[in-house]
From Swiss-Prot:
InterPro entries: CD200_Ig_V_dom, Ig-like_dom, Ig-like_dom_sf, Ig-like_fold, Ig_sub, Ig_V-set, Immunoglobulin_dom, OX2G-like
Protein name: OX-2 membrane glycoprotein
SS bonds (residue pairs): 51-121, 118-136, 160-214
Name of the gene: Cd200
Effect recorded for residue 57 to K: Enhances binding to CD200R
Source organism phylogeny: Eukaryota, Metazoa, Chordata, Craniata, Vertebrata
């Protein structure tokens, strides 16, 4: 006599509870989000950082901190109870310019090198839950570029220098053979870097009338600075030296002739005076 076998799906309540619990936690975590945006501003200008909390729970207090190597440093807090509270080290430097518990903004009135870095905004909600976001501030200084050239007896120097923050890079376009290139960098106390590149042309006559291009790479952009080498400048230097030498020679000859003539006149007058006395 055969036996009947009944199969039914296995269902364990603890397993389903665990799955649903994990899903609920993931869903609640996904609903809490802090939206931030990094900023890049010019040095010694006004800069603002903003945080937005995306949750239905009402925050109790918003705290801004600066990230440091050892531990974050408290800067300012805002709450409905106490309003804006700025730490002594940041007074007259920053303020909360957007007063809100879901949206908060801090503003640096005159950015300095110390203000560059990353900042955390912490939202304390009911139940002592803390949610944070990070926004970074980067400061820059636009490039100041100088391009010029100098002729020497046996070579030509073409110099291109750029000062900026962060450090720029220099390259050349339109150069030929027989040219040496040297580049050096100098760091300044104001956070900028000067990069100087010098082209040394062994035969200057080959570059007269041509155009050289100094290319400055800065923050992903390349800017061309053009310089045309004066066509007549190289030949005018020897000519000018010859003219100056000739003029000096003529002046010396004129002085010598005048001196001799004046001396002869004095001798003649002296002889006539002696004859009259006799």
């Amino acid at each position: 006599m055969g036996s009947l076998v009944f199969r039914r799906p296995f269902c364990h309540l603890s397993t389903y509870s665990l799955i649903w619990g994990m899903a609920a936690v993931a869903l609640s975590t996904a609903q809490v989000e802090v939206v931030t945006q990094d900023e890049r501003k010019a040095l010694h200008t006004t800069a603002s950082l903003r945080c937005s909390l995306k949750t239905s729970q009402e925050p109790l207090i918003v705290t801004w901190q600066k990230k440091k190597a050892v531990s974050p440093e408290n800067m300012v807090t805002y709450s409905k109870t106490h309003g804006v509270v700025i730490q002594p080290a940041y007074k007259d430097r920053i303020n909360v310019t957007e007063l809100g518990l879901w949206n908060s903004s801090i503003t640096f009135w005159n950015t300095t090198l110390e203000d560059e870095g990353c900042y955390m905004c912490l939202f304390n909600t009911f139940g002592s839950q803390k949610v944070s976001g990070t926004a970074c501030l980067t400061l820059y200084v636009q490039p100041i570029v100088h391009l010029h050239y100098n002729y020497f007896e046996d070579h030509l120097n073409i110099t291109c220098s750029a000062t900026a923050r962060p450090a720029p890079a220099i390259s050349w376009k339109g150069t030929g053979t027989g040219i040496e290139n040297s580049t050096e960098s100098h760091f300044h106390s104001n956070g900028t870097t000067s990069v100087t590149s010098i082209l040394r042309v062994k035969d200057p006559k080959t570059q007269v009338g041509k155009e050289v291009i100094c290319q400055v790479l800065y923050l992903g952009n390349v800017i061309d600075y053009k310089q045309s080498l004066d066509k007549g400048f190289w030949f005018s230097v020897p000519l000018l030296l010859s003219i100056v030498s000739l003029v000096i020679l003529l002046v010396l000859i004129s002085i010598l002739l005048y001196w001799k003539r004046h001396r002869n006149q004095e001798r003649g007058e002296s002889s006539q005076g002696m004859q009259r006395m006799k």
